[in-house]
Regions:
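An amphipathic alpha-helix adjacent to DNA-recognition modules
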Residues: 6-17, 26-27, 38, 45-71, ...
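Alpha-helical DNA-contacting segments of helix-turn-helix folds
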Residues: 20, 53-62, 98-101, 110-117
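The alpha-helix within a helix-turn-helix
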Residues: 34
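Hydrophobic alpha-helical connector segments
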Residues: 70-96, 136, 146
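Amphipathic alpha-helical segments used for helix-helix packing
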Residues: 90-110, 127, 153-163
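Amphipathic alpha-helical packing segments from all-alpha helical-bundle domains
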Residues: 107-133, 140-144, 171-182
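C-terminal peripheral helix-coil segments that are non-catalytic and often amphipathic
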Residues: 127-130, 163-199
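Hydrophobic alpha-helical segments that form the core
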Residues: 136-159, 170-179, 196-199
């Protein structure tokens, strides 16, 4: 009699990521995953007491996949641009994972403030202060505008509603960063002139 193959949590999570990349999160059920792995549902339920526990660990595992991808492209000397490009490129390269993480309620919903205050985003904002020689407040403003602009590009790439090559993605992001940095400078000049008029 052939020995039963044992599946660890790691095995199941790896196969889950492969399944989502191929078919999307909406198709993921215990039965469909078991069929994809080539086993019964027993190994899945042996590792997870219920589907919610499995989803919690899957969420972390998908974020790990995303973080590993982003890490390959980020340059701390040009943090805002490189992380924005990586975000949009991930949406193009791994649309099903991107959709799951950023276009459904699977990973939960956040306020703008909560988005700005994640560890990676705080790191990006602090790097912007050094690179662009702007205040922390201005760095947050620019980051917020660029972040959500880039998300717009990424969502269109994800659902294939726009065709952009690599060069076009880069140019769109670079131009938006420049526009927002000029906007900060203009706002500073405008406030200064307004103060003079009051005096």
């Amino acid at each position: 009699m052939a020995r039963a193959i044992k599946y660890s949590k790691e095995d199941i999570l790896e196969k889950s990521v492969d399944f989502i990349k191929a078919y999307g999160y909406s198709k993921l059920t215990v039965r469909e995953l078991a069929n994809y792995i080539g086993c019964s549902t027993q190994p899945i339920f042996k590792n997870y007491a219920n589907f919610d526990m499995y989803k919690d660990e899957l969420k972390l595992y998908l974020r790990k996949d995303y973080s590993a991808f982003i890490h390959k492209y980020v340059d701390i000397k040009d943090y805002l641009y490189t992380i924005s490009y990586a975000y949009a490129f991930y949406a193009k390269k791994e649309p099903n994972i991107f959709f799951t993480l950023f276009m459904t309620d699977f990973a939960g919903s956040r306020t703008v403030e909560e988005v700005l205050n994640t560890d990676r985003n705080i790191e990006t904002i602090n790097a912007m202060v050094k690179q662009y020689k702007i205040s922390l407040e201005d760095a947050k403003k620019v980051y917020r505008e660029v972040r959500f602009y880039t998300h717009g590009i990424a969502t269109q790439l994800c659902v294939n509603s726009i065709k952009l090559n690599d060069s076009e993605i880069k140019d769109l992001i670079k131009n938006n960063i420049e526009i927002n940095l000029r906007g900060i400078n203009y706002e500073f000049i405008w406030k200064k002139s307004k103060t003079k008029n009051i005096l």
